[in-house]
């Protein structure tokens, strides 16, 4: 600590009265103490921040597949799973596993819906889990949009476990954009093995040529597979027309063009490719899906030859 005689701008003058010198010294000491106190507070804040960063880094290392999808929000305990696979926590909150499309009482085979609920209950009930809260925090019904991670399980992510067992499929959402690639790969394995919902016609992939199947699923979340026969370009949208000629149209916002190209799916080269598209099916003016997220489009089978028509920019 600097003493008053050592402080810049402070000096003793013999001509000053003693009471003046004492007042100056008290003022200087208080200023110096204030500076030291502020420096100490800054150091404490820096240490707290570094500790928080270290804790966050430890969680990221422990749960690497979740790091891009959300933030750790503490340990919780699940005490119930309802028929829609919402998870009830001991603290009273309800958790919706974000980015998933799962069976429910009004959709899908009842035995598969029950198996999914039993699977989730066996995995979670009576155990502590790490709550990974996704962007947005809660939905319009007050449910916490999150994932639950079990450090001693494989996979640690409950959402990934459901996908791998075939009890859910990926439903692209803004909150899960960071881990969409990993989730789609896990889903692909369950679909190839025909697990769970992939045996159920209500959840199975619909071929673009199946007009009757498309009509029955109007207004619902679907996964469609088909070859792109033409790409149409407009000012704000792109139109991917799937075979046959009266097949589904995939409407893509032009703002996604760069993101699709960066992820290896340039729109101009999709003609002749077999793609898999997921989203809400609108059949009012012919079957169509509006694409709002790059993860809604996958290349199912890649070929080098062009399709029936070339894109018209």
Please identify what each model-predicted range represents.
Residues 27, 32-34, 51, 63-313:
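Small beta-barrel nucleic-acid-binding modules, primarily SNase/OB-fold domains
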Residues 1, 24-25, 31, 43, ...:
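Short hydrophobic transmembrane-like helices used for membrane targeting/insertion
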Residues 48-58:
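Sec-dependent N-terminal signal peptides
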């Amino acid at each position: 600590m600097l003493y008053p005689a050592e402080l810049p701008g402070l000096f003793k003058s013999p001509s000053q009265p003693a009471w003046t010198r004492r007042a100056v010294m008290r003022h200087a000491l208080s200023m110096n103490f204030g500076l030291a106190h502020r420096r100490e507070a800054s150091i404490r804040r820096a240490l707290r921040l570094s500790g928080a960063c270290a804790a966050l880094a430890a969680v990221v290392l422990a749960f690497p597949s979740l790091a891009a999808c959300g933030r750790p929000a503490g340990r919780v305990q699940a005490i119930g799973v309802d028929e829609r696979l919402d998870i009830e926590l001991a603290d009273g909150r309800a958790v919706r596993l974000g980015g998933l499309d799962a069976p429910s009482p009004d959709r899908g085979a009842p035995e598969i819906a029950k198996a999914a609920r039993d699977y989730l209950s066996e995995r979670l009930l009576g155990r502590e889990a790490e709550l990974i809260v996704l962007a947005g925090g809660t939905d319009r019904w007050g449910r916490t949009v999150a994932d639950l991670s079990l450090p001693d399980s494989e996979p640690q992510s409950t959402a990934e476990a459901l996908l791998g067992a075939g009890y859910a499929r990926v439903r692209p959402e803004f909150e899960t954009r960071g881990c969409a690639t990993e989730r789609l790969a896990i889903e692909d394995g369950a679909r190839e093995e025909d697990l769970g919902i992939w045996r159920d016609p209500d959840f199975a992939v619909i071929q673009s040529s199946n007009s009757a199947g498309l009509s029955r699923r109007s207004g619902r979340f679907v996964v469609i597979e088909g070859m792109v026969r033409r790409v149409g370009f407009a000012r704000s949208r792109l139109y991917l027309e799937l075979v046959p000629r009266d097949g589904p149209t995939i409407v893509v916002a032009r703002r996604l063009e760069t993101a699709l190209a960066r992820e290896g799916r340039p729109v101009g080269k999709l003609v002749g490719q077999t793609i898999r598209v997921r989203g809400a099916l609108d059949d009012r003016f012919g079957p169509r899906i509006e694409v709002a997220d790059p993860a809604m489009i996958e290349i199912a089978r890649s070929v080098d030859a062009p399709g029936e028509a070339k894109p018209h920019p």
